[in-house]
């Protein structure tokens, strides 16, 4: 554990970081809300514009999703040790998920009426993997893996691509192993809005990303309150 003391030269800076606002600045909030409304209004066109503006990549309807060829290429590029580590991580997630899952039950109450509960997975959920300095393979496993273990039929992943239109091979491999059925090459607030609201190309998901408290920018953290997205409707 790293310990900081008042006598340390970096103490004031660390104190400033620890005391930062839990909520985003108004300017960030306004920017995110504007992006959400824009995606709602313009759909795919807004996604392509933001990809060009923020990620410096030209996308269109033919390059918006990761293809099977790209997945196959990524699998060939990933080292065996990385594949093994991903498999072990997924096995651990499935082990935990299987034992923590709520179980169906039924019974007869005092009036002789049969009562029961069934717990069914969503048909279609979205997961978001932020971009940044390093590919967040762990995030794809810890979100997609749980949805996969729950039996979700359609797992839609969104993650930003690079200026060349490519996504990190290890991340792609992990997403496929975690059950992703679609991978959208879009990041940021526009990706979350597309998953929640839908566009011409992106079918909306049922579960609006409850696993949002992952690494990400201040704009991304603002999206933890998804009532703003549903309000766009």
Language-model features, listed with the residues they occupy:
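Buried hydrophobic positions in well-ordered alpha/beta secondary-structure cores of metabolic enzymes
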Residues: 43, 125, 147, 209-212
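General beta-strand structural signal in soluble alpha/beta enzymes
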Residues: 105-108, 127, 138, 157-159, ...
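Short acidic/polar active-site loop segments enriched in Thr and Asp
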Residues: 43, 153, 181
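Conserved small-residue-rich beta-alpha loop and adjacent elements
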Residues: 107-173, 233
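Conserved NAD(P)+-binding/catalytic subdomain of aldehyde/semialdehyde dehydrogenases
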Residues: 177-233
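N-terminal Rossmann-like NAD(P)+-binding subdomain of aldehyde/semialdehyde dehydrogenases
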Residues: 1-123
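Positions that flank functional sites
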Residues: 54, 162-163, 190
